[in-house]
Amino acid sequence: MAKITIHTPEEIEAMRRVGSEAADLLDFITPHVKAGVSTLALDELMLDYTVNVLKAKSACLGYNPGDNGIPYPRATCISVNNVICHGIPSEKKILKNGDIVNIDVTIEKDGFFGDNSRMFIIGKPTIAGKRLVEATWGCMWAGIEEVRPGKCFNDIGIACHNFVKPMGLSIVHEYGGHGIGRVFHGEPHVCHVPISTPTAKFEPGMIFTVEPMVNAGKRHIMDLNDGWTVVTKDRSLSAQWELEVVVTETGYDILTVSKGMPEPPTWVKGWKKPNFD
């Protein structure tokens, strides 16, 4: 089993700072996410804000994990409707009423990474789109609520699976959360479905993302030929939310926190959004 970094209190506070700025980036872009705007225009606004306001770098721009040989060409991932993840911003992709949109941002500052994503609904939502977006938000929190010392990473996958299964929704198997800190993608890989192999137990100081990708149809995926974009094989809608989580002595805390982030579901017991007023 690969070693998972245990972060010091000082490192956790550094991660909290960069995490809050990554969340602030999503707050900044929120009023611009509307019908008639291209995903490239949104990406350019966020890159400018990252560099000139946050004084940070985009971790996505030029990112090359080495498995496809194609550096990622934009600063953010913007995935619309049936795009599961890694949607490349484009001037040709114009948002329209009823679209569901995931915006995923990762910034690097002072040697640490902050990574989060948020769903947006353009104009009047469709019944199916609104249901999926809300269900995915709950799915993520169901997984997060399992985090506390003594439990294990597989408990996240079990909780996420059990949350959406009664709704007839499916969770993508091929992608998951990840450790994060001084590296963008570290150990562990966080599965959002149950797995049969043993997983590590949570220990205070572990930091990772929880980011289930939930499809309205079947779980199966298809890669487009641009080397990055992943879509649902049956063309059904897909949604994703992402937060950074740190294990504490008694439970967990959220590191990607901002004034504009949605309130957690009312049934969440382990965390309360801070008062920014």
Each PLM stretch: what is its role?
Residues 1-277:
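Active-site neighborhoods and metal-handling regions in enzymes and metal-associated proteins
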